[in-house]
């Protein structure tokens, strides 16, 4: 790929300009909106709306409360909750204090929660009431953890509308008690935009989770980059129905972007509760929706999804996992044509570094680099040689959206962030290629690319073809070392059969026949495993780490 950035020609045609580096904090935007558009709706949760004035006032109360608990600039606050109001209030409060947040997945086991609390040196944790036994149980272990604040799903509801049990235990502080009597005024601390705002842990699907340190500058700049590239993100009004959990970097950036552009953010505690999601979208129809392919498929399987008013929908974003053509076709029939936008990102890149410009979609591609970012394809072996157009290699990205490094892992930081031609590049570990216009096409994770007889087998390509079979609900390709041919892999296929084919005794033979007809011999799986369910991560990605353990 030439280093001339061919996508800039398209950006010139569309009038897309780089936002440069935006040196502001999330809290500064919230405070502006609370002052200038105080009555505008900011949050929607289980039928209740919060104006920007209330959003800012409650965040001020929480900032005062956290300061009373000893939280100071640079201290780490753990956010161990689903998508409830306290999470976004905490983000704003942390930004005001100059503290650091870290999202802790609600589905982690106690030992995993403890490991993250220790690794990030968490001082105070806000924990969901249903999860509080986990954090209370580890509070007495010497980790530096000083307080556990219990956040209930009903703290901001006049009447319970979502059945989520609460738990109040010893050695903890109730959120409502903490907030009682606090002032809704707060003088935000002077915060260096280069300082760390969030420590976001990688999913750990290919190894132990690492804490990516993201500055105020990187997260805010990335929100501007993505919005500048896809103009639909800037169109008012903005009503975002995001299915990403806030502890995930995509959910985090959705919340930050919506706040920056004075939009309304739907807080959905459990996006897998399709009935509740659809009910909320009917109450306040979305202009933007964001989800992984697996969730779109779950939603479309429920008749209620088809009853949502999508007439104002501008864009349906998808990412974090490959999306099949059959899913795209089905979604188009429900939401309307030319609204789906694929993209590509990762925690370490703030997270978005490739999106489709508005109305310039290219089939099979995930888009172009966001405005102000650079992208190259380099050889996997050395990471130094730029690959020609159309030839796959490792995807690397550069720009002001990149992380500052991995917390406490200098070796991993040096391996990921490398200097090349006078720039710092993030080596993503993903394999792809670009065409002559600079559009990026994904092939696979470098770790998921198999070698069979000297040929490269991209698991995503094989999985996508197999998902066209009516008998297959979901599948995953896993490579294992070929003992007979060192340096080669055996292609293993894990299959979750569709409901109507669960008892088909001829399922494996049908799959083999399909493969022989639709792909080269070296790509055909040598071992087929029929399992009850393909494991998924918290955000709906196929959990290949779990499958590898089962091999």
Where are these regions (language model features)?
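Flexible, low-complexity linker/hinge segments
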Residues: 15-24, 156, 161-196
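Conserved AMP-binding/adenylate-forming core of the ANL superfamily
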Residues: 21-22, 39-84, 88-92, 109-114
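Structural core segment of the AMP-binding/adenylate-forming
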Residues: 68-69, 96-177, 499
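Conserved adenylate-forming
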Residues: 69-71, 183-195, 199-242, 262
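AMP-binding/adenylate-forming catalytic core of the ANL superfamily
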Residues: 108, 115, 125-130, 399, ...
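Conserved AMP-binding/adenylation subdomain of ANL enzymes
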Residues: 220-239, 247-288, 302
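Gly/Ser/Thr-rich phosphate-binding loop
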Residues: 286-291, 300-362, 374, 384
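Conserved ATP/PPi-binding loop(s) of AMP-dependent carboxylate-activating enzymes
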Residues: 368-372, 383-417, 455-457
């Amino acid at each position: 790929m030439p280093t001339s950035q061919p996508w800039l020609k398209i950006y010139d045609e569309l009038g897309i300009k780089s936002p440069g580096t935006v040196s502001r904090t999330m809290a500064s935007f919230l405070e502006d909106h609370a002052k200038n558009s105080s009555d505008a709706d900011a949050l929607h949760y289980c039928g209740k709306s919060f104006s920007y004035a209330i959003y800012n006032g409650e965040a001020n109360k929480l900032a005062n409360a956290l300061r009373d608990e000893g939280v100071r600039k640079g201290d780490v606050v753990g956010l161990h909750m689903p998508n409830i109001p306290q999470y976004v209030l905490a983000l704003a409060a942390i930004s005001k204090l100059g503290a650091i947040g870290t999202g802790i997945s609600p589905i982690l086991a106690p030992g995993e929660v403890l490991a993250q609390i220790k690794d990030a040196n968490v001082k105070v944790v806000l924990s969901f009431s249903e999860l509080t036994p986990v954090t209370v149980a580890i509070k007495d272990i010497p980790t530096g953890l000083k307080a556990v604040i219990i956040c209930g799903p009903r703290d901001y509801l006049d009447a319970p509308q979502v059945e989520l049990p609460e738990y109040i235990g010893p050695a903890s502080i109730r959120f409502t008690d903490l907030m009682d009597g606090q002032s809704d005024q707060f003088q935000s601390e002077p915060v260096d935009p280069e300082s760390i705002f969030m420590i976001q842990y990688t999913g750990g699907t290919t190894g132990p989770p690492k804490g990516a340190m993201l500055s105020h500058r990187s997260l805010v700049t990335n929100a501007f980059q993505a919005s500048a590239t896809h103009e639909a993100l800037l169109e008012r009004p903005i009503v975002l129905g995001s299915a990403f959990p806030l502890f995930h970097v995509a959910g985090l950036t959705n919340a930050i972007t919506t706040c920056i552009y004075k939009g309304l953010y739907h807080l959905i505690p459990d996006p897998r509760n399709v009935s509740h999601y659809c009910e909320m979208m009917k109450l306040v129809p979305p202009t933007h929706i964001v989800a992984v392919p697996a969730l779109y498929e779950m939603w479309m399987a429920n008749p209620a999804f088809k009853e949502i008013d999508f007439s104002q929908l501008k864009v349906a974003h998808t990412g974090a996992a490959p999306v099949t053509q059959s899913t795209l076709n089905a979604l188009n029939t429900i939401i309307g044509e030319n609204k789906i936008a694929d993209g590509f990102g990762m925690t370490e890149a703030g997270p978005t570094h490739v999106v489709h410009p508005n109305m310039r979609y290219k089939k099979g591609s995930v888009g172009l680099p966001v405005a102000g970012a650079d992208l190259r394809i380099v050889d996997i072996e050395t990471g130094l040689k730029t690959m020609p157009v159309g030839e796959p290699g490792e995807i690397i990205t550069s720009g002001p959206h990149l992380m500052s490094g991995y917390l406490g892992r200098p070796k991993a930081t040096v391996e990921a962030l490398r200097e090349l031609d006078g720039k710092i590049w993030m080596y993503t570990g993903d394999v792809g290629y670009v065409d002559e216009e600079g559009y990026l096409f994904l092939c696979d994770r470098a770790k998921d690319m198999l070698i069979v007889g000297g040929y490269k087998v991209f698991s995503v390509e094989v999985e996508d073809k197999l998902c066209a079979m009516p008998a297959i609900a979901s599948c995953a390709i896993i490579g294992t070392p070929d003992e007979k041919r060192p340096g080669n892999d055996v292609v293993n296929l894990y299959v979750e059969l569709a409901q109507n084919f669960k008892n088909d005794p001829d399922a494996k033979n049908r799959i083999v026949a399909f493969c022989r007809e639709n792909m080269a011999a070296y790509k055909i799986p040598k071992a087929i495993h029929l399992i009850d369910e393909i494991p998924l991560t918290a955000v709906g990605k196929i959990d290949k780490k779990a499958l590898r353990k089962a091999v």
